[in-house]
Amino acid sequence: MKIRLASGRDKPVRFGHPWIFSGAIAALPDRAGIADVFSSGGELLGQGFYTPHARLAVRMLTHMGEPPFTPKTIEARIARAIDRRHGLIDEHNDSVRLVFAESDFLPGLVVDKLASTLSAQFNSAFAEAYREPITAALQNLINPERIIDTSDNEARNREGLPAIRRMNNREECLIQSGGIRFAAAIGSGQKTGFYLDQRENRAIVAGFTNGKRVLDAFCYSGGFSLAC
């Protein structure tokens, strides 16, 4: 499939932007899939996954000069993402975000490691289309006890994807973050089950509240109060 951009709409892609909105495309194809993206002048700018009828029409997978995208690219990118976070796991922390969507060149895919469980979100048409090779790569590279789908149904709706029935996916697992044990509600809780990105903030707050009485208002898992 080929997609040609409207005149003057190629600059963001040339500078590495991961998204192309429908208004930047000269003619919108009817089917979803991998597409070669061209400038209005016919220059190949890269490859992306096209989603018809979505405002965010193309999520870029490669840019100018990069090798073509293939299913094997998925495992290689997941492996690189895992390697980048290797130093974030230690004796006090067994949980971390392993894959962060466009930041790891895997659009719409979010994977959190919660102890020996993986919480995965397939929030784009690209991630859904490659669900099987993504799952196989995660099994091969990490060998988790289980992979639980915690996809964001609002995000999936924007992509024209069916909702995930989370009522059958409610699980809980014990994790360690900052040396503290937490019970993460996977599937029934917020987002992927735990706010892993607040680990450093919890440590900062604990540093200046030590020995003090603390009110943790509107808390989710009580992470900040437990850290104090």
What residues fall within each predicted segment?
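Short hydrophobic-aromatic micro-motifs
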Residues: 20, 37, 46, 118-121, ...
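Non-catalytic accessory regions of SAM-dependent methyltransferases
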Residues: 1-113, 170
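Conserved SAM/SAH cofactor-binding pocket of Class I
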Residues: 202-228
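Conserved hydrophobic/aromatic pocket- or pore-lining residues that grip, position, or stack substrates
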Residues: 116, 182, 201, 218
